[in-house]
């Protein structure tokens, strides 16, 4: 899957594996003809990239959003969002990944939401990955 963003292109692909159906993906950032792999957040070791989006602040600075979850079926309460700058640097974390309130689990996107507010960004419309 390819997501076109201003000045860049994001690639989301399945990582080949020995098993028949791989559920691991890789995200690459392409700028100026060069590709670099975006490092997944360490806390997402048990999850994989499932969506891509583009965001731009009021000054025109571009950012990229990668959504993490599970493939191929998704999961009940896992939609984490991570913000990257144009150099491919991860700008937020989700530590711990899950929070529990009133015996209900939900994804911890607090730092992501704080970064959006700090940078004056709106959560973008995300393109979901369809394996």
Q: How should each PLM-predicted stretch be described?
A:
Residues 42-50, 104:
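Repeat-based blade/solenoid architectures
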Residues 1-9, 15-19, 71-131:
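Acidic, small-residue rich beta-repeat scaffolds with periodic aromatic anchors
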Residues 1-7, 52-59:
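Structural signature of eukaryotic scaffold interfaces centered on beta-propeller domains
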Residues 26-43, 80-96:
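Surface-exposed loop/turn elements that mediate protein-protein interactions on large endomembrane-trafficking
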């Amino acid at each position: 899957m390819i997501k076109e963003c201003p000045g860049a292109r994001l690639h989301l692909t399945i990582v080949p594996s020995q098993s028949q159906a791989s559920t691991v993906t890789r995200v690459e950032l392409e700028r100026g003809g060069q590709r670099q792999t975006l490092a997944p957040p360490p806390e997402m070791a048990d999850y994989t990239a499932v969506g891509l989006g583009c965001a731009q602040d009021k000054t025109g600075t571009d950012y990229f959003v990668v959504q993490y979850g599970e493939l191929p079926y998704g999961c009940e309460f896992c939609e984490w969002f991570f913000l990257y700058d144009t150099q491919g640097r991860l700008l937020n974390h989700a530590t711990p990944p899950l929070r529990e309130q009133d015996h209900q689990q939900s994804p911890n996107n607090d730092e992501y939401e704080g970064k959006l507010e700090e940078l004056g960004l709106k959560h973008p419309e995300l393109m979901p990955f369809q394996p």
